[in-house]
């Protein structure tokens, strides 16, 4: 495919091969392939795409069905290169669309992805997403990576143990500008709620202090020591 030969695509595939060779025996290699809703924002423009979903929902579905093939193509190439897990960002966020929109346009597509890919999938949607978490929990995805705009406890309640949660340490305030104690407090909040995988809520600001990232792991270790004592 010409798509897979594009330099922007090849550099990711080649990077995964290098990571797999150097670190594959020690840590999971996690790839990333954008979902069709996010791709549609880039292809059509956010406003045009969202207005079109109101004016002609059938055309929107046809667009998503075509765009999802790029999600598969890129994702499968990463798996072939050595990715053990794939993150699927698909930004049907509560800031832009309703939970009902998610159910109508994306739930079935995400369920199909969970069946079609051969590795575990982590769905990511930024923003306020509690109203669509019950639908996400039914997709068969292995985990949902959620934003700090949703509290850990309400997120756990919303998914009702039907899907693992990943998150949701705040990036722009806590990790970027606060200290390690603040990071550990958020780690404790997540663990006390039952969140299974503790991680930053989204892409980490490049100037985040390394000690704040290390504090995530230290917070987990401290929590385990306290709960076992």
Model-identified regions with their sequence ranges:
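Active-site loop segments of alpha/beta catalytic cores
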Residues: 4-229
